[in-house]
Amino acid sequence: MLTVAILAAGKGTRMTSLLPKVLHKLSGKTLLQRVINSCNELKPDKIFIIVGHKSKEVEESVLKNKNIHFIVQNPQKGTGHAIQVLSQEVKKHEGNLMVLNGDVPLIKAETLRDLINFHDSKTADVSLITSRKKNPHGYGRVFTKNNLIERIVEEKDCNKDERSNLLTNAGIYCFSWKRLSKIINTLKSNNKQKEIYLTDTISLLKNSYSFEVEDNGELQGINNRVQLSECEETIQTLIKRKHMLGGVTFINPASCTISEESIIGLDVIIEANTHIRGNSRISNNCRIGPNSFIKDAIINENCEIINSTIFDSKIMDHVKIGPYSHIRPNCEISSKSKIGNFVEIKNSQLDQEVKVNHLSYIGDSKVGKYTNIGAGTITANFDGAKKYQTNIGKNSSIGANTVLIAPINLGDSVTTGAGSVITEDSKNNSLAIARSKQINIENWKKNKS
């Protein structure tokens, strides 16, 4: 049996934030959720999350699962105290207890599984992940003999000689609960910080093993925003490398960010300063960017998106969008359509080969195939209290600077005169003009007063 305890009670003072440290995000997921996800792959019987600072916010952030339980540590007196609090909940547990911090977002399930296997193979009381760091500043030092841990000294308690040791404590433990439960409540706060350290269990347990792994970045804990940024860069490098090896070209990968959930097809070209977020799906032979932002969008084959933003919409094949277009949620742009300069579309369906080339707003609308929307067209869909639908049939031509006052229905092959304000429905094959008659006054003299 395996129980997991994730320590997430701390404030994270060095983050200089109103947000609990474990709720800061990497590539769209909180630090804590990333740790939970890795632990879930081990299929533990239970995961206990030890919370404290802003505990309600932390609990609400976690994706609910029947094997996840929360325990409040109040006050927070250190890592050892957290497990003392936990011990009141798991008195009859049999098997292993894995303990890790909620701020190691890059930890892999494979590494955790290897730790458990190592621990079981040694019949250890405790096994601890360790690594050698070129710069061990901020980490507790681990002192071993024949792979058995003699002691761990927190950096704040290290003397000069102890600080020179490069073997560090990653803060990830696998305990035999049967043995740990006998000594956990004997821990004292005999240190400079007046905290109860979990590391003090090492001297009280007989078979304490070091499980040394290569420091490849996955053990990085997050204590400040510099480290947060470094981890973000690590994640993004891995994501983009995977896509490049899978057939995607990045013109300037360092300037782009891609969510882990996004799927990108073959021969897609991602230009500089492009960001693809959420559950986006981009099919083969598309060109995205430069300077584009796409979130939760489906983009079919052979599309071109330039300097534009697309949210939660579906773009069919051979569509060209941009530059400077904004596709807001709940839009569907059908095949071979063209959305051009400074166009905003919201909650609308455009049938195939529709052209909206310039300076237009299309909201809460349905536009039939082969229709051309002239420059400056506005669908006036909001009366200050309620939004209304605009329907435009196929093969229509909407003149420049037309305002369509919704609710309104234009049939097939309707033409509107440039500058018109259309307030009434128009039937098929009609011309709709609604504008003031031009008056020319000769010999006009401007009043200079």
Swiss-Prot record:
Active site location: H358
Domain of life of the native organism: Bacteria
UniProt: Mg(2+) binding residues: D103, N223
The protein's required cofactors: Mg(2+)
Pathway where this protein functions: Nucleotide-sugar biosynthesis; UDP-N-acetyl-alpha-D-glucosamine biosynthesis; N-acetyl-alpha-D-glucosamine 1-phosphate from alpha-D-glucosamine 6-phosphate (route II): step 2/2; Nucleotide-sugar biosynthesis; UDP-N-acetyl-alpha-D-glucosamine biosynthesis; UDP-N-acetyl-alpha-D-glucosamine from N-acetyl-alpha-D-glucosamine 1-phosphate: step 1/1; Bacterial outer membrane biogenesis; LPS lipid A biosynthesis
Residues holding acetyl-CoA: A375, A418, R435
Family named by the database record: In the N-terminal section; belongs to the N-acetylglucosamine-1-phosphate uridyltransferase family. In the C-terminal section; belongs to the transferase hexapeptide repeat family.
Name used for this protein in its record: Bifunctional protein GlmU
Organism of provenance: Prochlorococcus marinus subsp. pastoris (strain CCMP1986 / NIES-2087 / MED4)
